[in-house]
Amino acid sequence: MTTTLQQRESASLWEQFCQWITSTNNRLYVGWFGVIMIPTLLTATTCFIIAFIAAPPVDIDGIREPVAGSLLYGNNIISGAVVPSSNAIGLHFYPIWEAASLDEWLYNGGPYQLVIFHFLLGVFCYLGRQWELSFRLGMRPWICVAYSAPVSAATAVFLIYPIGQGSFSDGMPLGISGTFNFMFVFQAEHNILMHPFHMLGVAGVFGGSLFSAMHGSLVTSSLVRETTEIESQNYGYKFGQEEETYNIVAAHGYFGRLIFQYASFNNSRSLHFFLGAWPVIGIWFTAMGVSTMAFNLNGFNFNQSILDSQGRVIGTWVDVLNRAGIGMEVMHERNAHNFPLDLASGEQAPVALTAPAING
């Protein structure tokens, strides 16, 4: 008997690299999307940290009134932010090499564009990496579909809204108080609280929280006892076990009697699909709402107050929203020559600007 030994051809360096990139045996899966994701997210994170700590004031409104956002210029963790790029730049792409100097680039808010462009590209690739890893492992692709909800929301506030408003200075600042300022101004200019898509988003987020708490508490309350009373119930589960760790029949019976029979799921798969779909669809609607309001397709506006037969104002919740919106909009426009046009023009309409007198 003759045995022939053939030496295996060594794989090229490129093939070895491809195998390492796509290997699911690595501690952290890289993937082809990860090749772009890793450097872009590292760049965005590094620039954000440096700008949050030490960036000089930015002329956000383009009127030579710089706004300081970094820690070294008097802010704290709550008030600090990476200030959006200047209104003088508008929607122009503003990399470092487009500025005459580094000082000019910093003054016009160049770090903001650098952070958001690299961040958005990074999270897009993170979404693609989720699909890629699911594909390699033979899983279904719903993880990346769920992740598309926060990705679409981030894209709406950082990219779509500035495009619709005509300037990256209208983008959301990268900070805690900057986020709240963005929300106030958004309400003042677009009446987002009266937009149906925002209402669906609120239902998605709060409803998702409620359903998550209900599901977790039901499962925890119907665990199959595998331990003694002096041991933690967590020891009753072994990773990879085939047996159910909780009694879905008991949970179904409890919840069906607590509310009514058909309010409870009797199928674990449909239950978990519902838990995933509800908040995702809600946040999708919010992202669509912000994207449409970016082009000034705003929420419902009830600008005229309700009047009685003698012309006196009947105060409603709408009047409260209108008064708050007008106040926030005026405070937002810091320079007189850029007074909000919807406040400076138009026919006079009776609006409840004073609190009703209470006689008692």
Curated annotation (Swiss-Prot):
Sequence positions that bind pheophytin a: 126
EC number of the protein: 1.10.3.9
Recorded superkingdom: Bacteria
Site (Tyrosine radical intermediate) residue list: 161
Propeptide residue range(s): 345-360
Keyword Calcium: yes
Binding site for a quinone: 215, 264-265
Main location group: membrane
Gene Ontology, cellular component aspect: photosystem II; plasma membrane-derived thylakoid membrane
Record-annotated site: Stabilizes free radical intermediate: 190
Site (Cleavage): 344-345
CDD domains in alphabetical order: Photosystem-II_D1
GO molecular function, one term: iron ion binding
InterPro entries in the cross-refs: D1/D2, Photo_II_D1/D2_sf, Photo_RC_L/M, Photo_RC_L/M_CS, PSII_D1
Compartment(s) of residence: Cellular thylakoid membrane
Note: Cyanobacteria usually contain more than 2 copies of the psbA gene. 2 of the reaction center chlorophylls (ChlD1 and ChlD2) are entirely coordinated by water.
PANTHER family tied to this protein: PHOTOSYSTEM II D2 PROTEIN, PHOTOSYSTEM II PROTEIN D1
Assembly mode: PSII is composed of 1 copy each of membrane proteins PsbA, PsbB, PsbC, PsbD, PsbE, PsbF, PsbH, PsbI, PsbJ, PsbK, PsbL, PsbM, PsbT, PsbX, PsbY, PsbZ, Psb30/Ycf12, peripheral proteins PsbO, CyanoQ (PsbQ), PsbU, PsbV and a large number of cofactors. It forms dimeric complexes.
Protein name (Swiss-Prot/TrEMBL): Photosystem II protein D1
Underlying gene: psbA
